Amino acid sequence: MKFPILLPNIFNHPFTYESDLDLKVGDYVVVPFGKSKITGVVWDEFEKKNNKDFKLKTIFKKLNVTPLKKTTIKFLNWFAEYNIIPKGMALKLVLLSSNAVEISQKDVFKIFKTKITTNTIKLSDEQQKSLRKMNISNEQFRVHVLQGTTGSGKTIVYFSALKEIIKKGFQGLILLPEIGLTSQFEKKFLEFFGIVPAIWHSGISKKRKEIIWSGVANGEIKVVIGARSSLFLPFKKMGLIIVDEEHDQSYKQDEGITYNARDMAISRASFENIPINLITAVPSIETYENIQKGKYSISRLEQRYKNASLPNYEIINLNETKLEKQSWLSKKIIDKVNSHLDKNDQVLFFLNRRGFSPHVLCSKCFNNYSCPNCSINLVWRERGAPLGPTVTRACLHAPCACRPSWGVGGHD
């Protein structure tokens, strides 16, 4: 019998093989390809017919792995077409190092025990209202946005939603924008659920990834917390996707296969016919537009959890504040910093990008240092050093008449 086998490579079509094995769509198999052996998946359609008569090769074996779901296959077909990549490259995102993992010993999954412990955390009335609006009991596709200020308890709300999903035997995925957030987030998860989640990102060892991949495929692992790539894990019974900090630009992958993980998560939820929650303090423009059109539902947390007070802050308008000579900090800021330093307190300055100054002005004539070719502001990097070029050698700037020592510049 003939079978269409999609391989994790640059081809946009499956290859036809023959076998006497009892195979169905989604089964993982090992096949000959050239002079090597490669893992592929029985796909849902054959390659386009041609007039050439090829001698078909025989499938070596069927792997003892839970088959890839038909809904996942449909998602990968759509993903490849939408992002203009070969279907084989889309499949490569699912397979671990271009292979499926056979793990027969179930004791390796003991660290990811599924028995949830009872916690004493109680939701506020506002949080309970948001949880009800999520409507997770309705196991159908819908996008819900949970918006709340920092410290409003958004995490506890969607943890509660996820808890109900796990109790029903489903699996959940929590997407985070940055790898650095996973370790801190893991502690919160352990405190709430009493179980260890599977952490997935590029920094995880190959052996650990093999265990997680297999555990997700056979349903032993119930919750995965990960970066963009975790979206392509072969979940056996996915029930809920949560995208934390949905507005974060880190969800966009710009190297290799380019895609927006937030948007692809919404699409995967649609193919799986499951709910997805977007968590944010400030919705992205795309999300806001969909809320306005009524495509996404939304609930808001206006108060901080347990009525915690907001930090005191003050905006200092530099247009109305006279600065000291040779200084770009107002006297009020300097006095505040000095008062804390006198008390042996610590002071932290947040800069919105690398470099000492992303916007360099001449303090005498207020000339703005920018690239003459692209108008991007030049960045001051080292104290006493020129504005070092970092992107293009074409960014040469004539020195300011007031500061002849400032010459060559560059931008980020």
Where are these regions (language model features)?
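Accessory, non-ATPase domains that flank or precede helicase/AAA+ motor cores in DNA-metabolism machines
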Residues: 1-280, 287-288, 292-308, 342
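Gly-rich Lys/Arg/Thr-decorated short loops/hinges at beta-loop-alpha junctions or inter-strand turns
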Residues: 113-114, 244-248, 312-317, 378, ...
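Alpha-helix N-cap/helix-start and coil->helix boundary motif
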Residues: 179-182, 284-285, 355-356, 368
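A broad detector of the eukaryotic-type serine/threonine protein kinase catalytic domain
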Residues: 194, 247, 320-323, 376
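Conserved interdomain linker/interface between the two RecA-like ATPase lobes of SF2 helicase motors
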Residues: 268, 275-277, 284-290, 295-363
